[in-house]
């Protein structure tokens, strides 16, 4: 029975692989439950990736500023060691007195998002869960440690479960605060461990044990069933920190758990995650573009958020290429999603409530793009959708045209439910005449072939 399920799911997921680009290193899972969950995840299309932590207090670029690499920009006149100590000291200031995960979940539900990924620990090592293996956690360090909701991850996951989101835990494999990763005995020249493992094997052994223990805390049931384990920090592989020892128990607790050991390739990267970019063509396996709503992953005081129109256009392109969009939105230092972001997200959600049929539960089609138009298909292939991505600063034209994907009968405009005619020219070009009175937003069309 398991072999038959596995074969069916593999065929369903790869049935149009010949139409798409290939990526080196992707390995399809062999666990039928993982394949089944991947298929369900591919129905969702739109999720949120939340970065929150010490870096949110001053509103800087996540924890990267404590990494001593040439591309990092720190305040003029600051020393590296002085800056690092200042950053660690933010653990005494992190005090999200307005922490409201229910508000987060409501905002993202209103946006039409269907899955979430939350940073339990970024590279700086500061844990947003109550870890037994370090004191560098919100539950033990700083003023929020006395708050009854100090085990932040628990409340975040629970809030999103009530909204039927798929639940994802982000976890950084590198931990710059841990003495077994960045030893205080040596300088820290870059993001990697700052000692030679062959000279200090016990240090590395201690780090592997520490990481396995923390992963066990997150995946072992204390935080409920998880759908996605999203592992960041690709300069260390999951294999190096005992991931293969953790996963069997994690999947016993959370059957079908999707593991994303990102950028590593191989059997534990169940879907791939291009960052701040979209692949040029369709891909032949599950993938997600993780992209920010503003310029940065965490909250900043001057975010320069993308418009709802731009996010919708991006989502249409990603969906037509077979992927999902994890949109980065960071909570404020006080613990809410700011209204400036919520307004944009609600506008996206209003469009998806009317036009989401062209996005959710769809699969790719051979002719997937013509200019500003992105095509998707229903799972059975009997219905096609065309999303006209309306570029910034442009108005809707009275008609839109494409080649191929010739409609059979009338075309439904999902934005307002009206049916319109489509004409086919001698050269095979399809022209659809848009009804008057449409809002200036991307247009989604539905038709049969």
Residue ranges and their predicted role:
Residues 1-4, 108:
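Positively charged n-region of N-terminal signal peptides that target proteins for export
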Residues 22-449:
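Mature catalytic domains of secreted/periplasmic carbohydrate-active enzymes
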Residues 8-15:
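Bacterial N-terminal signal peptides
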Residues 5-7, 123:
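N-terminal targeting/docking segments
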Residues 17-19:
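Short, composition-biased linear "edge" segments at structural boundaries
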